[in-house]
Amino acid sequence: MKFKIGESVAVKSGVTDPDFGFDISGWQGRVQEVDSTDTVFIRWDSLTLNQMGLDLAIRCEEENFDWEVMTLAITEVEKASIRDTEDDVDRVASFMKAKMIEMGK
């Protein structure tokens, strides 16, 4: 299945985070890029960022991972309805970054 840039996708049931191994079923975001190796680069939506929480974002920062985005196989995601706006994503991400700075992370 091909996805378009900006299209909303959801992670399929049973998919785990490739770095930490926990379940990310249902996480949603927007397609930023699709490459020729059948992987899709996703920027998480604001609801997923809120669900992820500050603790995981901090853990990602400590491991030098970008917590706002993830690359998954095309077979691991499916089309979904858009749940927010890009402004919502920017607002939540900025809030989380500010909290990390406050905490000295």
Model regions: which residues?
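Basic/aromatic-rich interaction segments and small domains that mediate binding to polyanionic partners
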Residues: 3-76, 80-90, 102-105
